[in-house]
Amino acid sequence: MFLKNLQIKNFRNYDSLDISLSKGTNIIYGNNGQGKTNLLESIYVLAFTKSHRSFIDKNLIKSDKESAIIKGTILNNIPYNLEIILNKNKKQVKIDNNSVSKIGTYIEKMNIIIFYSEDLNLIKGFPSERRKYLNLELSQISPNYYNTINDYNKLLKIRNDYLKRINNGEDINQSYFKILTDYIMEKSVFIYQMRNKYIERLNKVCPDIFKEITGRDGFKIVYSPSINLENFEKETIRNSLLEAFNNNLEKEIKIKSTLYGPHHDDFDFVLNEENLRNYGSQGQQRIAVLSLKLSEIKILQDYKGTSPIILLDDVFSELDHQKKNNLLKFIDNDMQVIITTTDLDNIDKQIIDKSKLIKIDKGKIVEEVR
C-alpha cells in the first residue's frame, strides 16, 4: 500500500499543494513553522477523516476560508481515490468521487501508523488517550468495530441524557430506558471482545520487540476493562454489565452519567509487574511506545496482507543512534515511509541517498529531488 499523490487546498497554512510521493522513503524537510507537520497531518486526516492534533475540524481550515479539501490516490493492488472536504459545520467523505455514509468502510482503505513526539501520552496521558488509540487501530482492522463504537457513543449520550432527566425529577419511559441499556450492553460485548483480542495479539508481538531492543524480558500490555471479568465470553460480559448497572443506578442518576462500559476502559504498559507510567524511566517509556507502534506494523500486515504507510514526524531528532537503528530495522524496504525533519543531518546518509527529498517553505514546495 502506498500514497501515490496528495492534493491539499486551504488546509492549515497551505493555500494549495500538489505533491507526488515515492513508493519508498520520502523526506519532507525545512525550517520550523513551514508546514511539514501540517502536511503529515493532512495525510492522517485523509486516512482517518479526523486529526490527531485537533478535535475541531474547523481549526484545520485555513483562516478566512470556508472549506478545505484533501485528496489522495492510494495504490493497493487497485487504486482508490480518497477525498475529504471539510466545511466549518460538516464533513464530506468520498471514495472514487462517491460519497460514503459508513466511515468504517472508508477508513479500511488506507492504513497508516504515525510516530510523533506526543506518543508518550499513550503512557503518561489520560485513559482517554489510550482508548482513542485502541479505537483507531481496531477501526483500521475492522469497519464493523468503527461502526459499533460510533453506535455505542450515540447510545451512551442518550442514556446519559435520560439519567439527567431522572435526576431532574422528570417522568421517563422506563421500558425504553431498559431497551436502551440492553442495546448498550450488546454493543459493549463486541467492543470488549475486540479490544481483548487486539491486546492479546499485541502481547504475542510487543514483548519480543521490547526484548530485542532492550534485552529485557517481562514486558506486556495489560487490558483493564471498567468491569470485573473472569473471561470475555458473551454471557460473562452481559451478566457483569447488568450487575454493575443494577447495583449502581442510583449513583448514576446522582452524577447523571453512565459509570460502567467500554468508555471507562484503560490499558497499562507493564515491565516485571511494575506499571511503567508510575515507575518507568522516560527511556523505558519511549521504548515501550516504540515497541507498541512497531507491533502495529506486524498486526496490520497479518490482518490486511499489506504493509501500512509509516509517518515519522520529526522523531529522529529525539532518538539516539541506537533507537534510530532499532526503529529502521523493523521497517521493511517495501513500506512507504514519509519522514519530516528540520535538519537532514538527523538522518543517516544511506537513508537520504535512497529517498525522495522535498523541501517545504511557507506552505510551498521549493525544492524536490528524485
Which residues fall in each region the model found?
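Walker B catalytic acidic pair
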Residues: 313-315
